[in-house]
UniProtKB/Swiss-Prot annotation:
UniProt lineage: Bacteria, Pseudomonadati, Pseudomonadota, Alphaproteobacteria, Sphingomonadales
A Pfam family this chain is assigned to: Ribosomal_L17
Origin: domain of life: Bacteria
Keywords of the record: Ribonucleoprotein, Ribosomal protein
Official protein name in the record: Large ribosomal subunit protein bL17
Segments passing through the bilayer: none
Protein family: Belongs to the bacterial ribosomal protein bL17 family.
InterPro entries recorded: Ribosomal_bL17 (IPR000456), Ribosomal_bL17_CS (IPR047859), Ribosomal_bL17_sf (IPR036373)
Quaternary data: Part of the 50S ribosomal subunit. Contacts protein L32.
A cellular component term, taken from the record's GO annotations: cytosolic large ribosomal subunit
GO biological processes: translation
GO MF terms held by the record: structural constituent of ribosome
Source organism per UniProt: Rhizorhabdus wittichii (strain DSM 6014 / CCUG 31198 / JCM 15750 / NBRC 105917 / EY 4224 / RW1)
């Protein structure tokens, strides 16, 4: 019987789900807003909120617990230094999920998950290689 067994499988193996939540939580901490499916956003929310609660408590043991779940040193630093201070006076509810319509290709419900009181300038920050005019000239 599966009484009180929570969480969605999202048609993935356990290791794939773990990797998915690690990557999405790192992206959310970095950009403070990401677009994903509604089901993934609903599963990601408690994962990230527990990380912020660990960061608010501080300490070496909590930092190691957060690192075990996140495994991204730069985002871990931002989590403990920036986000923990930002949400020090807030008791939970650090994220919000906003429905973003239907994806055209497969009709999946999309959603934006973002931090409450987020830094608007963090969105799209260093999101990959950027082509410069020199790169375009060399390719031609």
């Amino acid at each position: 019987m599966r009484h009180r067994v929570g969480g969605r499988k999202l048609q993935r193996t356990a290791s794939h789900r773990t990797a998915l939540f690690r990557n999405q939580s790192a992206a959310l901490i970095k950009h403070e807003q990401i677009l994903t499916t509604l089901a993934k956003a609903k599963e990601l929310r408690p994962y990230v909120e527990k990380l912020i609660t660990l960061a608010k408590k501080g300490g070496l043991a909590n930092r190691r617990l957060a690192h075990a779940r996140l495994q991204d040193d730069t985002q871990l630093k931002k989590l403990f230094e920036v986000l923990a201070e930002r949400y020090a006076s807030r008791n939970g509810g650090y994220t919000r999920i906003v429905k973003a319509g239907i994806r055209a290709s497969d009709a999946a419900s999309m959603a934006i998950i973002e931090f409450v009181d987020r830094d608007v300038s963090a969105k799209g920050q260093d999101s990959g290689p950027v082509e410069t005019d020199e790169d375009v000239a060399e390719a031609a």
